[in-house]
């Protein structure tokens, strides 16, 4: 469950290391985002000479949460960190690599690129 002010790790090679959620998209008073939801983030920490700079406001999709996600069979998938992948205005990842596992819940039409780049799909 990601909400406003939540700090997330970045699971791609866009150059950002940490981002902060500034808005959960999808509804005027929506409070929480889970895996597969799009959020508005600001870059808090970035590496030098990267595609994104500190202070940039971007869209991102949540790929891992500590809270976890419940599957229809009753199992729960939890991770050790909250992580996101930074998107461009067309909802496509700006990075060319994804780090760490992602969940099968991202397997929708708009996030198939993330699934194909990920080293492991749980």
From Swiss-Prot:
Name under which the protein is recorded: Large ribosomal subunit protein uL14
Biological process per Gene Ontology, one example term: translation
PROSITE patterns associated with the record: RIBOSOMAL_L14
Similarity comment text for this entry: Belongs to the universal ribosomal protein uL14 family.
InterPro entries: Ribosomal_uL14, Ribosomal_uL14_bac-type, Ribosomal_uL14_CS, Ribosomal_uL14_sf
Protein's organism: Acinetobacter baumannii (strain AB0057)
Keywords for the protein's UniProt record, in alphabetical order: Ribonucleoprotein, Ribosomal protein, RNA-binding, rRNA-binding
PANTHER family reported in the protein's UniProt record: 50S/60S RIBOSOMAL PROTEIN L14/L23 (PTHR11761), LARGE RIBOSOMAL SUBUNIT PROTEIN UL14M (PTHR11761:SF3)
């Amino acid at each position: 469950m990601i909400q406003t002010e939540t700090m997330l790790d970045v699971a791609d090679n866009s150059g950002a290391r940490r981002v902060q959620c500034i808005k959960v998209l999808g509804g005027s008073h929506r409070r929480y985002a889970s895996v597969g939801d799009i959020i508005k983030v600001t870059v808090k920490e970035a590496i030098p000479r990267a595609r994104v700079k500190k202070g940039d406001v971007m869209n991102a999709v949540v790929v891992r949460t500590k809270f976890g996600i419940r599957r229809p069979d009753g199992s729960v998938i939890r991770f050790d960190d909250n992580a996101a992948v930074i998107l461009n205005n067309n909802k496509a990842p700006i990075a060319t690599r994804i780090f760490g596992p992602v969940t099968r819940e991202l397997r929708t039409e708009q996030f198939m690129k993330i699934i194909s780049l990920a080293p492991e799909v749980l």
